[in-house]
């Protein structure tokens, strides 16, 4: 029942197909909108180090939106990955999961740096690693 409900909700918002967008370079697309409606190979999630999604109800972060509309299976897959790994996901690293109820095929989860006070060169390098991984 969850799957039918989530797919219907996403369809109501309208699916955006990558074939209707223009690449900024071969195979790379830059698009602004609701990432949970994008039909493509993979979307990127700004994840936390636990990798199991945001736990603040109705929080408007990308992590919560992706986990909520993908369905509970995504949290279960991320939990399984993290249990095998036995530690939090390091900043700048990435994991790939199935997308479940989202129109894309995969989700790339990457953990960005937490900038407390002042941006440092290490913060910049950690963020660059998110894109490289």
Model-inferred region functions:
Residues 1-133:
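Macrodomain-like recognition of ADP-ribose-binding/processing modules
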